[in-house]
């Protein structure tokens, strides 16, 4: 943390990853309103940070302001699959160059995802194996490709380089695996990310059963006014379990939620709700993990669960 930002006169390009959360406790503006980019990328809009933006309208307004911050004659690379993003782009300034993107062409073979673009000047279709998977990741890669294109990086250069990209930290992080089992943990906690992450794992391993755990840990996810945003988000999992710690709610000084509220909000009758982390360990120990994957999603730690130990035990169990 000694050097969180470094700017030099010799750098011709500066890349910032920022979001709509507050710049600091004393500067209540969203971080991304301070950047004034020449090239902006907008990947999607899904309501979050209810403690700062209590209504969806107030949340959406920040993204409108973000687009307005783009420099004169700048570029906006945006995901056209997101209806909220599309609606904002329609009303963007006329001097802004609009560059849409969506899910690229790909295929999955033997648990590996390949990008399959048609590159100009090549006889055969390109085939690029990736270390990441899931349509949300592939869509983001496509957006990154178009940003790179604006600064002179060719598509072929991008595709060759992206095959070594291991993904963002704490996103679909492989904890353990055996020939017929895989255990992933992921930072997903917002409804859209939970849904996308579960769908990614299920699509990558369609023949395997998937058990997915989600810890409600953030202020938004534990707020009764936000819980309904999670409706249907875990439906793709074969077994879905939500965990929350009532003591965390007390610590955050928000109104308590009940197991019944959680189950109703997720709109899945078979959903299980745990409030004691010991129940998680017991559940995992009682399952058969042959041809069966485990996914654990949280911005926290499931109250200190030892992921590495669980992974090692499950691998031994499946050998």
Across the structure, where does each feature detected by a protein language model lie?
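ATP-dependent carboxylate-amine ligase
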Residues: 39, 64, 90-97, 143-319
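Conserved phosphate-binding catalytic cores of ATP/NTP-utilizing and phosphoryl-transfer enzymes
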Residues: 1-6, 137
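Short gly/ser/thr-rich secondary-structure transition/capping motifs
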Residues: 1, 18-26, 58-61, 100, ...
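Switch II (G3) loop of P-loop NTPases
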Residues: 13-25, 183-189
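Switch II of P-loop NTPase G domains
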Residues: 21-36, 192-200
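Acidic, Mg2+-coordinating active-site environments of NTP-dependent enzymes
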Residues: 15, 36-183, 207-208, 260-264, ...
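Short, glycine/acidic-enriched loop or turn micro-motifs at the edges of active sites
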Residues: 20-22, 46-47, 82, 188-190, ...
């Amino acid at each position: 943390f000694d050097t969180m930002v470094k700017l030099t006169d010799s750098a011709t390009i500066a890349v910032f990853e920022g979001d709509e959360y507050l710049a600091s406790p004393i500067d209540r503006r969203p971080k991304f309103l301070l950047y004034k980019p020449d090239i902006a990328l907008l990947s999607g809009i899904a309501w979050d940070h209810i403690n700062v933006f209590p209504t969806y309208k107030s949340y959406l307004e920040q993204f409108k302001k973000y687009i307005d911050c783009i420099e004169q004659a700048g570029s906006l690379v945006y995901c056209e699959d997101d209806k909220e993003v599309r609606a904002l782009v329609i009303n963007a300034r006329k001097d802004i160059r609009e560059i849409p993107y969506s899910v690229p062409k790909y295929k999955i073979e033997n648990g590996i995802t390949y990008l399959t673009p048609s590159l100009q000047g090549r006889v055969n279709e390109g085939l690029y194996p990736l270390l990441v998977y899931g349509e949300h990741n592939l869509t983001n890669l496509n957006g990154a490709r178009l940003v790179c294109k604006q600064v002179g990086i060719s598509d072929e250069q991008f595709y060759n380089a992206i095959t070594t990209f291991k993904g963002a930290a704490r996103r679909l992080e492989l904890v353990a695996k055996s020939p017929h089992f895989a255990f992933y943990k992921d930072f997903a906690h917002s409804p859209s990310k939970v849904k996308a992450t579960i769908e990614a794992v299920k699509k990558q391993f369609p023949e395997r059963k998937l058990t997915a755990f989600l810890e409600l840990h953030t202020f938004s996810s534990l707020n009764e006014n936000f819980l309904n945003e999670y409706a249907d988000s875990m439906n793709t999992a074969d077994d879905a379990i939500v965990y929350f710690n009532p003591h965390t709610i007390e610590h955050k000084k928000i109104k308590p939620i009940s197991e019944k509220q959680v189950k109703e909000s997720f709109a899945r009758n078979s959903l299980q709700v745990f409030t004691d982390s010991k129940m998680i360990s017991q559940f995992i120990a009682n399952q058969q993990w042959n041809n069966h994957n485990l996914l654990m999603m949280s911005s926290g730690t499931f109250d200190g669960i030892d992921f590495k130990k669980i992974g090692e035990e499950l691998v031994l169990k499946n050998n």
